A protein has these predicted regions:
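Conserved beta-strand elements of the Class I
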Residues: 31-35, 116, 206-210
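Generic C-terminus detector
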Residues: 256-262, 268-287
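Residue-level signal for inorganic ion chemistry
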Residues: 15, 65, 101, 145, ...
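Phosphate/Mg2+-binding loops and adjacent switch elements
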Residues: 38-173
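C-terminal accessory "lid"/substrate-recognition subdomains
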Residues: 123-259
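Short, high-confidence coil segments that cap the C-terminus of an alpha-helix
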Residues: 30, 92-95, 111, 204, ...
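Walker A (P-loop) phosphate-binding motif
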Residues: 1-51, 155-156
């Protein structure tokens, strides 16, 4: 079992790192499964995802993973021990490794490898316990990790920054430290059959950036590197978009000037928007 998690609330990039690990393990011929509690899903108990599973049934992050890796087992269960037991009973093929999403503080599970993520812009050594800060437990909890990854590093990070952060984190010899950064992919229409024309940014677009993630700042910076005209419409992490939210998105989109307008959202948010019954044609053409 491999646990990927953090000790701070908010986004550190668990899902992209989980997807990266899936690819690494698959390349080694390992039959991998993922298990999470399925945060904000509208169901309970153990569910093994299928191609027909909805985002409401399993949650946005498991839905995203199952969509990108249809051949692996993706399960949700608020009882991690029970979920692991169920996955390990599966055959043809049997599960060789289980990736546990956000289970770093689940003390009933003893993972063979614990990977702890910490945001470059808010290192755990600079943080404080809730409610003064964002830590769920004291920073010394990092000592349970065999691997620590500093995520969301800027492209221009310098060697001296590596040295400074290494000293400040003050890890033990048994712990390995890595640094990672996001590499954003190309823009993709949420509804290809309805998209109008090109979907590239050339610098003259008016963009409405819709996010429902914990830390949108790096994404905002990325989008602004393509076009300066970016309006941010920010919702809470894992936000369950309602009819009023869609009306607000359309209203903000209509406030953009000119004909070269675009709505950009994240891959995770797209899972919650795509099958929404109240998503109208205007939004479908422009997201």
């Amino acid at each position: 079992m491999i646990c990927v998690g953090n000790i701070a609330v908010g986004g550190t990039g668990k899902t992209p790192h989980t997807e990266y690990l899936i690819k690494l393990l698959q390349n080694e011929g390992i039959n991998v499964a993922t298990l999470s509690r399925g945060y904000k899903r509208k169901s309970k108990g153990y569910i093994l995802a299928t191609a027909e599973s909805s985002v409401q049934k399993i949650g946005d992050e498991p839905y995203q993973i199952k969509s990108k890796f249809p051949d692996i087992r993706v399960a949700v269960d608020e009882n991690r021990c029970h979920g692991i037991e169920q996955l390990l009973t599966l055959k043809n093929p049997a599960v060789d490794a289980v990736l546990l999403d956000d289970a770093f503080q689940h003390r009933h599970v003893k993972a063979g490898m614990n990977i702890l993520l910490t945001d470059y812009h808010r290192l755990l050594c600079d943080d404080a316990l809730l409610p003064a800060g964002r830590l769920r437990e004291p920073a010394c909890g990092k000592n349970r990790a065999q691997i620590v990854i500093v995520t969301k590093c800027p492209d221009d990070i310098k060697p001296i920054d590596f040295n400074i952060i290494t000293k400040r984190l003050n890890l033990y010899p048994y712990q390995q430290l890595y640094f990672s950064r996001f590499r954003y992919g190309s823009l993709m229409p949420l509804f290809p059959e309805k998209a109008k024309g090109r979907i590239t940014c050339t610098g003259d677009e008016q963009v409405l950036l819709v996010t429902g993630i914990a830390s949108p700042a790096p994404l905002v910076e990325e989008v602004k590197s393509y076009t300066p005209s970016v309006s941010l419409l920010e919702f809470g992490d894992h936000h369950d978009f309602g009819e009023k939210d869609l009306l607000l998105i359309e209203k903000q989109f209509n406030l953009l000037k000119g004909n070269n307008r675009l709505i950009i959202t994240t891959e995770k948010d797209a899972t919650r928007l795509k099958n929404h019954p109240n998503l109208n044609e205007t939004l479908k053409r422009n997201i």
